[in-house]
Amino acid sequence: MSQIDKASRRQKIKDRSRKQVHGNEKKPRLCVYRSLSQIYAQLIDDDNGKTIMSVSSMSKENRALEGTKCDVCRIVGLQLGEKAKAQGITKVIFDRNGFRYHGRVKALADGAREAGLVF
């Protein structure tokens, strides 16, 4: 499968799932983006169109992390869950953004669940 086919396939899945996934202030959308070497996660309030918080493997505290990509993703999920609990957010809607729920995306979700987020 060529790169263009993969990108268009992911975009179609993303568009289909975005019709059903909608976050608000009390239950924001946990949006995940996975690049080749990094991972980014945001809590988004779709009603107001604002990002509540974001955590990534590129942030200052995460740049020096050792281990596999999956280990780093789990740590990013833990950090996101801890920050969300500090702001009083316990329930979220998981948006895998067209990526398969497997590998690094699953590791981030498991880390967020370990930190106490419910989805």
Swiss-Prot record:
Instruction: Cite the SUPFAM superfamilies for this sequence.
Output: Translational machinery components (SSF53137)
Q: Where is this region: Disordered?
A: 1-26
Q: Which GO terms describe its cellular component?
A: cytosolic large ribosomal subunit
The keyword Transport appears for this protein: no
InterPro entries from the entry? Answer: Ribosomal_uL18_bac-type (IPR004389), Ribosomal_uL18_bac/euk (IPR005484)
Q: How does it assemble?
A: Part of the 50S ribosomal subunit; part of the 5S rRNA/L5/L18/L25 subcomplex. Contacts the 5S and 23S rRNAs.
Q: Which HAMAP family match?
A: Ribosomal_uL18_B
- Name by which UniProt lists this protein: Large ribosomal subunit protein uL18
State the organism of origin. Chlorobium limicola (strain DSM 245 / NBRC 103803 / 6330)
| Name of the gene | rplR
